[in-house]
């Protein structure tokens, strides 16, 4: 099935036709000056969904996510704490990887650290100087001359002639009102940089943020990538500058598909520490929410729409996951009779799967996929309530254990994309299932003493039986 993705460069949905196998995917990772906040994780979960969909559709993927461990913010933090850059960044790097695990975000194939690629960055800067697209300024920093790159502004759709140009800027982050030559190498300033610098042919200093991503991606993925993803705030200047640097170095198109997720708002306001609406994942975990609940909330909206984050939304995510958990537990009930997979159940499963996948291939429309999932759950629950398969005029077969197992297999399949379904109950060993069946047989003939003995035997194997109006459930203790 063809995959269509919205390409920021063309402003159109395009059929995904990778030029590489495996697909070369680069995503902007954290700047490790602080704990990542939920706005960051909205982007990381969108990128995780993208990767999972590619894998689900049968593509091989080689994924690189960078770690920015040298920039204005990390240097300021290290200087304030009076420690080395590595010592300052390390706790935030560890926390980031722990957060990825909590949110069920698949690991990248490589996590390059900017500080490990300084020699390659220096070499690239020298190459750009030799080509005449970079120059040493009066402040001894090295700048990229945007006038030497005719396609500058194509990604962010800027008309350079209509914008006010400044001479140059050495800040890592700036807005479109300050369009100017950007820094490739920042000359050493002892008051600003303390003891942190690298030697180079241009003098002591450190690389600019934009150059770091270009060199790490080229070093690990080559000169032409299939997909580069990030947040909309990265379009300008960061990704615009990446294109200028990378294509000046290689003289080849840098990226085929650019994908960007929209902003996350908190109570319809921009997240900021001054407004008191700034949350890290740890803040939410401390409030009693789970990683799955946070993931579900950040996952459920389309990535190109603003997502409004609220406490009510988190509680709604909790209820959605409870509904999913209850459905899965119901399917795991071992009391269903042995029988065939009924054609009506198989047809319902196939119809749902086709809708689920079709939505995903339409620019990762996860909202429609989730709507299809809950509609499917409603239909299956209704059929179980009626003690039948999906009813037709000619077939009213009893819902079977095989029906349940077929649906569970389908849910496990789609969870390769969602990464959030609460399969809380592990596989039940065959010997425990045998004891459960023996207990059910004893109960049917009202041999309560034997039924109790078998219950105790099941308990001794760390499983419990819950008898309810809708049947019996087995749970791991």
Swiss-Prot record:
Enzyme Commission code(s) on record: 6.1.1.16
The cofactor binding remark recorded in the entry reads: Binds 1 zinc ion per subunit.
Membrane spanning segments where? Answer: none
Source taxon at top rank: Bacteria
Reported cofactor(s) = Zn(2+)
InterPro entries in alphabetical order = Cys-tRNA-ligase (IPR015803), Cys-tRNA-synt_Ia_DALR (IPR015273), Cys-tRNA/MSH_ligase (IPR024909), CysS_C (IPR056411), Rossmann-like_a/b/a_fold (IPR014729), tRNA-synt_1_cat_dom (IPR032678), tRNAsynth_Ia_anticodon-bd (IPR009080)
Catalytic reaction annotation: tRNA(Cys) + L-cysteine + ATP = L-cysteinyl-tRNA(Cys) + AMP + diphosphate
Q: Where does this polypeptide localize?
A: Cytoplasm
Any GO CC annotation of this UniProt entry: cytoplasm
Q: Which family does it belong to?
A: Belongs to the class-I aminoacyl-tRNA synthetase family.
Q: What is the protein name given in its UniProt record?
A: Cysteine--tRNA ligase
Which organism is this protein's natural source?
Answer: Chlamydia trachomatis serovar D (strain ATCC VR-885 / DSM 19411 / UW-3/Cx)
């Amino acid at each position: 099935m063809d995959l269509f993705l919205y390409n920021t460069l063309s402003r159109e949905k395009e059929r995904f036709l990778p030029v590489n196998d495996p697909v070369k995917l680069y995503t902007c990772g954290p700047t490790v000056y602080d704990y990542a906040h939920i706005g960051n994780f909205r982007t990381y979960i969108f990128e995780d969904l993208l990767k999972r969909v590619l894998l689900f559709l049968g593509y091989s993927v080689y994924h690189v996510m960078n770690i920015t461990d040298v920039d204005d913010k990390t240097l300021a933090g290290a200087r304030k704490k009076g420690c080395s850059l590595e010592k300052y960044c390390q706790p935030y790097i560890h926390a980031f990887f722990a957060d990825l695990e909590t949110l069920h975000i698949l690991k990248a194939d490589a996590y390059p650290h900017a500080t490990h690629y300084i020699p390659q960055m220096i070499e690239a800067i020298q190459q750009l100087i030799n080509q005449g697209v970079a120059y040493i300024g009066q402040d001894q920093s090295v700048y990229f001359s945007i006038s030497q790159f005719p396609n500058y502004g194509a990604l962010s759709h800027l008309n350079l002639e209509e914008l006010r140009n400044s001479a140059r800027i050495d800040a890592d982050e700036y807005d479109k009102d300050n369009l100017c030559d950007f820094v490739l190498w920042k000359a050493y300033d002892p008051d600003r940089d303390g003891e942190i610098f690298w030697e180079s042919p241009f003098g002591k200093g450190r690389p600019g943020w934009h150059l770091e991503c270009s060199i790490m991606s080229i070093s690990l993925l080559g000169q032409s990538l299939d997909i580069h993803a990030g947040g909309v705030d990265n379009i300008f200047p960061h990704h615009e500058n990446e294109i200028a640097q990378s294509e000046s170095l290689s003289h080849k198109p840098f990226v085929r598909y650019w994908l960007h997720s929209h902003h996350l708002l908190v109570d319809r306001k921009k997240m900021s520490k001054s407004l008191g609406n700034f949350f890290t994942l740890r803040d939410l975990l401390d409030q009693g929410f789970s990683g799955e609940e946070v993931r579900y909330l950040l996952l459920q909206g389309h990535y190109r729409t603003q997502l409004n984050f609220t406490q009510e939304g988190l509680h709604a995510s909790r209820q959605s996951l409870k509904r999913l958990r209850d459905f899965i537990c119901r399917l795991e009930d071992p009391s269903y009779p042995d029988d065939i997979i009924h054609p009506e159940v198989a047809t319902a499963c196939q119809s749902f799967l086709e809708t689920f996948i079709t939505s995903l291939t339409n620019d990762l429309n996860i909202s429609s996929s989730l709507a299809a999932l809950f509609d499917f759950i409603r239909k299956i629950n209704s059929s179980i309530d009626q003690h039948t398969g999906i009813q037709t005029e000619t077939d009213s077969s009893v819902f079977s254990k095989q029906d349940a197992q077929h649906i569970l297999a389908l849910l496990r399949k789609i969870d390769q994309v969602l990464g959030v379904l609460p399969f809380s109950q592990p596989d039940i060993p065959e010997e425990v299932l045998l004891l459960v069946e023996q207990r059910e047989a004893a109960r049917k003939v009202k041999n309560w003493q034997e039924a109790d003995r078998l219950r105790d035997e099941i308990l001794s194997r760390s499983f419990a039986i819950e008898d309810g109006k809708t049947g019996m459930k087995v749970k791991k203790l």
